[in-house]
């Protein structure tokens, strides 16, 4: 897919890997929507990219809330009239073993790390398919492939993300779609 002028949405884009992904997309000629829950960091990231002459939009988004993800999609279409790429990158981690993780920490981790990508896929897939081609990527972790010690909720969420993206890719291929799906599993 030629990326020039295409539109990418990156969650968790205010810092770290998300900002690096947004920077890479922008450098390749894409218009980029940066989404993050941290408003101050998001404003800084948007300034950083726009000061380089890139076409960017920042949208404060809590990916654990479907209404926020839907508002992100609406803002993207309103600003750029299209979306071609979604990168579900927002994530959190709680370092606690199964049996010692509070139910609140389980819910928080699963809401952001698993439900966030689910909301992203379900909200953005129809919009991306309207373009005739595109890509949806979700960031998991090596913990999505191999359970690490004392990372119960994180392991479960990231295994779910790997399964979500494998299921999505299979469904897209079965439908002979020009949209692709992939999962990124960074780790040591």
What are the functions of these language-model segments?
Residues 28-44:
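Conserved glycine-rich Rossmann-like NAD(P)H-binding loop of the short-chain dehydrogenase/reductase
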Residues 52-55, 75-86, 94:
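A glycine-rich helix->loop->beta "capping" turn
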Residues 121, 157:
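Active-site helix of classical SDR
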Residues 97-98, 105-107:
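Substrate-binding pocket helix/loop in short-chain dehydrogenase/reductase
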Residues 39-40, 60-71, 103:
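The beta1-alpha1 cofactor-binding region of Rossmann-like NAD(H)/NADP(H)-dependent oxidoreductases
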């Amino acid at each position: 897919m030629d990326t020039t002028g295409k539109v990418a949405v990156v969650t968790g884009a205010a810092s770290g890997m998300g900002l690096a992904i947004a920077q890479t997309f922008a450098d390749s000629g894409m218009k980029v929507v940066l989404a993050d829950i941290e408003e101050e960091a998001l404003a800084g990231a948007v300034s950083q990219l726009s000061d380089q002459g890139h076409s960017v939009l920042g949208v404060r988004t809590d990916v654990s809330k479907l209404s926020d993800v839907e508002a992100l999609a609406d803002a993207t279409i309103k600003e750029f009239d299209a979306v071609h790429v979604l990168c579900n990158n927002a994530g959190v981690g709680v370092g606690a073993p199964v049996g010692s993780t509070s139910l609140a920490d389980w819910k928080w981790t699963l809401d952001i790390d698993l439900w966030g990508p689910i909301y992203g896929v379900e909200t953005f897939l129809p919009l991306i398919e309207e373009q005739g081609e595109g890509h949806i990527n979700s960031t998991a972790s090596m913990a999505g492939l191999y359970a690490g010690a004392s990372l119960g909720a994180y392991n479960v969420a990231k295994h779910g993300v790997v399964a979500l993206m494998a299921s999505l890719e299979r469904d897209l291929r079965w439908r002979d779609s020009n949209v692709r799906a992939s999962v990124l599993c960074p780790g040591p």
